[in-house]
Amino acid sequence: MKLFYLLVICALSLAVMADEKPKLILPTPAPPNLPQLVGGGGGNRKDGFGVSVDAHQKVWTSDNGRHSIGVTPGYSQHLGGPYGNSRPDYRIGAGYSYNFG
């Protein structure tokens, strides 16, 4: 009988402790500034395949968040087909953005 009471007391104490929320609540970290990637391709055996990859990365933002500058590099190439491989096309661009808000 003592064992039964001991088990009941343990079960009740565990049930009470399970309802308590943790006291330590950490703030959610800011998401990292990762680049946006876009890629694509397609084709067939007869005409060859095209491949393209572009990225966009914000490199600077003003303190108030209204002004920002971004960089956009890219690569594309046609592979195979009746005329063979094309030369790779490398490109890079920069852009400025203003938020009217």
From Swiss-Prot:
It comes from the Eukaryota. Induction: By bacterial infection. Keywords: Amidation, Antibiotic, Antimicrobial, Glycoprotein, Immunity, Innate immunity, Signal. Residues 1-18 form the signal peptide. GO terms for biological process: defense response to bacterium; innate immune response. The modification Phenylalanine amide is found at residue 100. Glycans are attached at residues 28, 72. Coiled coil: none annotated. Has activity against E.coli. Belongs to the attacin/sarcotoxin-2 family. There seems to be a family of diptericin in protophormia. Diptericin A is the predominant member. This is Diptericin-D. It comes from Protophormia terraenovae (Northern blowfly).
